[in-house]
Amino acid sequence: MIFGIGCDVCALDHLEKSLSGPHAAAFVRRVYGPAECTALALDTPLPAGHSGAHRLASAAADFAATEAFLKAAGTGLREPFALREIEAVRLESGAPAYRFSGATARWVADHGLTAHLSLSHDGGMALAFCILETAPET
């Protein structure tokens, strides 16, 4: 049974300002979890001559995934959720999936939820779509 559906978009140019501004390190620590920071190399400067377009698009999609989850949960950003506890990761197949930690993982487990995630980016925008599903009642 569907528990909730959430969708979010993120403008790449807006996120780029957050990732390159004077408070970029604090933003990354607050918003992205450890697996996302590693996969996106958010704590590593880009090599000279590298545009970072793919990294930026992936970071925007991951940010949108977090927002989409919060909308599907129906709570917005409030207790027990912390942004960095809601991570968008890639499976071995390349498909996106959620990884939860801390109080968010407990909330998901307590509600018996399975989270489904779809990501896309094009034309300077990233999109995430989240479906939270409960097990069918028997």
Residue ranges of each PLM-predicted region?
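Core catalytic alpha/beta fold that binds nucleotide/phospho-ligands
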Residues: 1-138
